[in-house]
Structure formats: structure tokens, C-alpha cells
A protein has these predicted regions:
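N-terminal Rossmann NAD(P)H-binding glycine-rich loop of SDR-like oxidoreductase domains
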Residues: 17-39
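N-terminal Rossmann-fold cofactor-binding loop
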Residues: 46-51
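NAD(P)H-binding glycine-rich loop region in Rossmannoid oxidoreductase-like domains
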Residues: 52-110, 114
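Conserved Rossmann-fold NAD(P)-dependent oxidoreductase catalytic core, especially the SDR/UDP-sugar
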Residues: 84-86, 96-161
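Short-chain dehydrogenase/reductase
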Residues: 102-109, 147-148, 155-170, 198-202, ...
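NAD(P)-dependent short-chain dehydrogenase/reductase
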Residues: 171, 176-239
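Mid/C-terminal beta-alpha module of Rossmann-like enzyme folds, strongest
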Residues: 237-331, 336-341, 345, 362, ...
């Protein structure tokens, strides 16, 4: 078990900012860790249930935020924390169905409470909390919503842990009379480099391509009819977290965050085929949730053949059902586009080319030996 060092307990006077990143091995958390770890004047404290498999300068704490006693024991000595980036989420085995349950909402609210309570007790001078949401705030998991979605749009039918968390966070600050501010970021289809994340389509693309190639098949798109999508690079979210935590214009505000363009899988799929040196085949709709688990025994052979890190297929892609959802399998086209004008007006102007993003992230997963070249 990774232990909290005395330097973190007492605080390092040479550091201007001390940030806790919850979910530091998730898609967003990992990008945030690497971003803040590279900044001058920031000390990073990373929270996760498992140790990292990459070099970094953070102090790691192994903690299960679902366990209130464990969280209090591990986090109650975190003095001098100035920022919290909350990038963790509890997902049920059937990810999409879980979104509609009260259990999903209750567990995610409790996790936030189990962290913020002892953290604020130990670090009363906390300045800022960044909380992540997404298009479920606009009912995207329920069906089509008004386009473009704006931060001022009314809420949709609960249960929804986004609403529970943001209400509790505001009430808790008022109850304590605390001085910290908060910012809520709402990204769209978050893409990054991560292992064990149930909502990371990049890993799903890489594994699907590698397995298809191993069988000698062309790369066929398995999703639904053509549709216009919108995505957010996790590295972009990390930069937005820095902005949100240091710019007064972001205080106590909600912002949609996206790459700034749109995409269609039909345009991206040829780029992926080229990256894996595969022939591009015609679209072949099929459920990856039904077909890919049956290929789990092939993955160790791919790992050995290409010298990859020894993760299982389930480690790499915990939820093929989520990949089906993002690919639009069995769905009619259902655009989920958001307006990012509010963030731009408030000073966050960063953007990313989505096609280039997918190629870069897949290449990084290859370089880190998660998927084959």
C-alpha cells in the first residue's frame, strides 16, 4: 500500500499550489496528473485504488472513496491542500443501465462526501474544487436533447448524481462558511490514455483493431449509421482544470468543454486503419459487448507476441457496452452537441483537432505498450 509521506502531511513551503487529483489513473485524472506534474510551483497528490505503471513525480495514496472510514484515515492528514480535481466516478457493470439507478447516484455522491469532508477538515484554506460532469447533465443518456446544449438549460429527469453532487457541494460550502470556490466542467466523450476506465473509447478502438488484425481481417466499423459527434481530449480537460482553478472568471460557474470541432467515425476510421497497417473494410454493424468478450483468450497471445504490458482484455476495456454506445450501435443518429461559447467568453480558448487526437492517443497507447503497433 502506498503511504502518505510526512512532506505531504506538513506541506512544502516551496510549493505555491498543492493539488489532490481523485481518480488519478482514470482517463481524465491521468491527463491531469501529467499536466500538473509538469508545471512549476505545483505539488501533486494522486488518489487511486491501484499503483501507477508509469513514472511520475506525484505522491500516491491508495484509497477507496466508497469506504468512508478508509477515506478519513488516509486523507485526514492532508494539510495545506489548495486545489482538488475530482475526476473519479463509480460505474456499475452495465454502465449505461447503471446511469438510470438510484444506487449509481447515491454511491457517487457518497464518494465525493467521503473525500471533501476530511480534506476540508485538514486543509481549511482550500481554494478551489473542480468537479467533472458531462452530457448526462443535459439528459444525453435518456435521448435527444436541445442542440446546442447550454449551461443554462434546465435539468432533466433524475436520478442523476451530477445534480446531487453539485447541490451538496454548494450546500456544504455554505454550511461550513468556507471560502473555496468551485467550477464544474462538462466535457463530451472524453478520450485519453488509461487502463481500467469503463468509459474510454480509445482503448476500445485499439483493442478492436488489434484483434481484427490478428485474425487477418480488415478494419470494419462496427457501429451504427453515420452521425455527427463531438469529443473532448483529456489533455484539454487538464488544461481547463488549471484555468478553472486559477482564473477568477471560472469561480462558481459551470462550463461545457469540448475540442471545438465535430467528427464522423467514417472520416476517422481510415486514419485508424492506416495506423494499424490494415485494410479498410466496409461497415459491419455488430455489438462489441456480445462479441468481444469471446476473444479474451486471444489477448494474452497478442501481449506475448508484441511484448505488451501484461493487462487482460477486460483490464484494457472494462465495458464494451460503452464502446457500443459511443459507436451508436443499435441507435438512430442522436447528436449530443454542446455550446462552448461560455468558456471562450470567460477566457478558455484552447482547442484540439479530433481526428489528430485519436491518432495521437492511439500512438501513445502503442508507445506505452498497452496495444500493439
Amino acid at each position: 500500500m502506498l503511504r502518505l509521506s510526512s512532506a505531504v502531511n506538513t506541506g512544502d513551503e516551496n510549493m505555491t499550489n498543492r493539488i489532490v487529483i481523485a481518480g488519478a489513473l482514470g482517463t481524465v485524472g491521468r491527463a491531469a496528473l501529467e499536466h500538473f506534474d509538469a508545471l512549476e510551483g505545483w505539488e501533486v497528490i494522486a488518489l487511486s485504488r491501484r499503483p501507477p505503471d508509469f513514472d511520475n513525480g506525484a505522491t500516491w495514496i491508495s484509497v477507496d472513496l466508497r469506504d468512508a472510514a478508509d477515506a478519513k484515515d488516509k486523507l485526514g492528514a492532508l494539510k495545506g491542500v489548495t486545489h482538488l480535481a475530482y475526476a473519479t466516478v463509480y460505474e456499475m457493470p452495465d454502465v449505461a443501465k447503471g446511469w438510470l439507478t438510484r444506487e449509481h447516484a447515491d454511491v457517487n455522491l457518497a464518494m465525493l462526501q467521503n473525500l471533501v469532508g476530511p480534506l476540508v477538515d485538514a486543509s481549511p484554506d482550500l481554494r478551489h474544487i473542480t468537479l467533472l460532469q458531462g452530457t448526462k447533465a443535459y439528459g444525453g443518456h435518456l435521448g435527444p436533447f436541445k442542440i446546442p446544449a447550454k449551461e443554462s438549460d434546465p435539468r432533466y429527469m433524475p436520478p442523476n448524481f451530477y445534480y446531487d453532487q453539485m447541490d451538496w457541494l454548494a450546500d456544504e460550502r455554505d454550511r461550513r462558511g468556507a471560502g473555496w470556490t468551485w467550477t464544474i466542467l462538462r466535457p463530451q466523450i472524453v478520450c485519453g490514455v488509461a487502463i481500467g476506465s469503463p468509459m474510454n473509447v480509445v482503448a476500445g478502438i485499439g483493442a478492436f483493431a488489434a484483434i481484427s488484425r490478428e485474425y487477418g481481417m480488415p478494419l470494419r466499423f462496427p457501429g451504427g449509421d453515420p452521425r455527427i459527434g463531438e469529443a473532448t481530449d483529456a489533455r484539454l480537460i487538464a488544461r481547463a482544470m488549471e484555468w478553472a482553478g486559477t482564473d477568477a472568471r471560472a469561480a462558481d460557474e459551470v462550463f461545457n468543454i469540448a475540442n471545438g470541432d465535430v467528427y464522423q467515425w467514417e472520416a476517422i476510421w481510415p486514419r485508424i486503419a492506416k495506423l494499424f497497417d490494415m485494410e479498410l473494410g466496409p461497415r459491419h454493424p455488430m455489438s462489441l459487448a456480445r462479441t468481444m468478450p469471446g476473444n479474451a483468450d486471444l489477448w494474452p497471445k497478442i501481449v506475448e507476441k508484441h511484448g505488451l504490458l501484461s493487462y487482460s482484455l477486460a483490464d484494457l476495456v472494462p465495458s464494451w457496452g460503452f464502446v457500443d454506445f459511443i459507436f451508436g450501435h443499435g441507435q438512430r443518429p442522436n447528436p449530443h452537441n454542446m455550446s462552448t461559447i461560455k468558456a471562450r467568453k470567460a477566457g478558455f480558448h484552447d482547442c484540439v483537432d479530433t481526428e489528430e487526437m485519436f491518432v495521437e492517443l492511439l500512438q501513445e497507447m502503442q508507445e506505452r505498450r498497452y496495444i500493439p503497433r
